[in-house]
Regions:
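Noncatalytic, solvent-exposed loop/strand surfaces
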Residues: 1-189
Length: 189
């Protein structure tokens, strides 16, 4: 949606749910859209396709540049890195794969099963992924050539989904699950 900041006039609005599929009865808009170079990528899981919008130079109109069902991120976020999107998709509430798409075209570079869908962050040249069902954390080399897992570990077993997003500060990886905050030193020794 684009709005005139002075008058409140709506220039344009986009309904991802209505226009690009959705599992019946589901509404899930938990991902922050990504803006780059006059374009917006948005996704929201439950089979709503990921959609790239191209804005007019004045921002008062937008049109769909491409759409792709391979990256319909449930609630784990998406990373834009060097012209490629990385994230996980929603197959159903129990399953999802990890995906890399080309920003300009929506072309699927790869799609890989790794435990389950989840959240993703980027720091110091690496992707950190956290799957939501069993608490596995993986370290990935960003690549358009395939899913390149460097290492992985699993959080101590606890009940419930692993939905919190990780964060990194001062060479420490912070991971919350329930009432527990895990802190891992990820600095080079």
């Amino acid at each position: 949606m684009a709005v005139d900041p002075e008058t409140g006039e709506v220039y344009w609005a986009f309904d991802l749910v209505t226009d690009y599929g959705y599992a019946p009865g589901r509404r899930n808009n938990t991902n922050t859209p990504l803006f780059y170079n006059g374009e917006i990528f948005t996704t929201s899981g439950y089979d709503a396709e990921g959609v790239m919008l191209k804005l007019s130079p004045d921002g008062k109109s937008a049109e769909v540049k491409w759409h792709n069902g391979a990256l319909d991120t449930h609630h784990g976020g998406v990373i834009l890195l060097d012209g490629y999107l990385y994230g996980s998709n929603w197959i159903n509430n129990g399953n999802g794969n990890w995906v890399c798409l080309e920003w300009d075209t929506g072309k699927v570079m790869w799609e890989e099963k790794w435990y389950n869908k989840g959240s993703i962050i980027y720091a110091d040249g690496l992707l950190y992924i956290f799957e939501e069902k069993q608490g596995h954390i993986g370290l990935l080399e960003p690549s358009t050539e395939g899913f390149k897992l460097i290492s992985e570990f699993r959080l101590e077993s606890r009940s419930g989904p692993y939905w919190a997003h990780m964060t990194i500060s001062d060479k420490k990886l912070f991971v919350r699950h329930g009432e527990v905050l895990y802190v891992y030193d990820i600095g080079k020794s």
